[in-house]
Amino acid sequence: MRVTDFSFELPESLIAHYPMPERSSCRLLSLDGPTGALTHGTFTDLLDKLNPGDLLVFNNTRVIPARLFGRKASGGKIEVLVERMLDDKRILAHIRASKAPKPGAELLLGDDESINATMTARHGALFEVEFNDERSVLDILNSIGHMPLPPYIDRPDEDADRELYQTVYSEKPGAVAAPTAGLHFDEPLLEKLRAKGVEMAFVTLHVGAGTFQPVRVDTIEDHIMHSEYAEVPQDVVDAVLAAKARGNRVIAVGTTSVRSLESAAQAAKNDLIEPFFDDTQIFIYPGFQYKVVDALVTNFHLPESTLIMLVSAFAGYQHTMNAYKAAVEEKYRFFSYGDAMFITYNPQAINERVGE
């Protein structure tokens, strides 16, 4: 399969730079996986699409202010993007500089350069940085960090992004990008879903900066996925198995929830799904056999991204590309702050040939 098979024309004007005034007021394009039928509506229509006993699985990661600015003590400006927090004093990060710092280099971080840190080691493209400060990494980031808005949101981060670029149920700090499908859920909608009898469970996947990296190979089978840490605890496993047993659906909110659940299913030895606490490099593209997820809530993704490949594996390639074409024609808003899709699984997707 070629990466270019997943390309589509997207006018710049359809990229959302700000969220809707109300989280749940965005548009919703529903795609029936088996038939490819499309329905246009608003996000609150989700309430009518879910049945009592269906299980919604959310990702409760919380975005950290992961972008830092400063300079090397020896001179030269730097930009640091945290990939993950290693412990209370150390981070693994991408560093942008005219000349990469060497191990032992002193860094002065923050708009006032008040935070002292040392680049201690290099791991491939990533740099290990240790803060010389009595505060924890998280406290330092909250103090001097900027929200790491995606590269296609072409504006500086604003104070409002600290809440708008978080889900209302975010709990565990560690992501450098929001699980954006969850941004559309507000408390009134969650309350209505609970009142209807829709069950809810929470996985954790700390989204890494790699989620924005373009696929740099021509053939997608050659692509190596970035690694992200995921947690699928026992209570989620129990909820999934119970939903399946009573004939209800497991609905993943976002591709990160999909990747968490399907990683746990891949690693399971004795059951459909078992608890999972580990890094995952799962790469889902057409031909992938889904084991857990029956329906998906997701945003519109970048052309040629691993995420549109994941959706194509779920709904079928042709159905997915047709839906994206319709979304462009109907002027849906794209990417992190954009509109959403509700997609049901297409069991025939696994047999579909792509790009032939």
UniProtKB/Swiss-Prot annotation:
An example Gene Ontology biological process:
queuosine biosynthetic process
Supply one GO CC term from the record: cytosol
Q: Which reaction does it catalyse?
A: 7-aminomethyl-7-carbaguanosine(34) in tRNA + S-adenosyl-L-methionine = epoxyqueuosine(34) in tRNA + adenine + L-methionine + 2 H(+)
Q: Which InterPro entries match?
A: QueA (IPR003699), QueA_dom1 (IPR042118), QueA_dom2 (IPR042119), QueA_sf (IPR036100)
Q: What does the UniProt record say this protein does?
A: Transfers and isomerizes the ribose moiety from AdoMet to the 7-aminomethyl group of 7-deazaguanine (preQ1-tRNA) to give epoxyqueuosine (oQ-tRNA).
Describe its partners and assembly state. Answer: Monomer.
What name is this protein filed under? S-adenosylmethionine:tRNA ribosyltransferase-isomerase
Look up and give the organism this protein is from: Escherichia coli (strain K12)
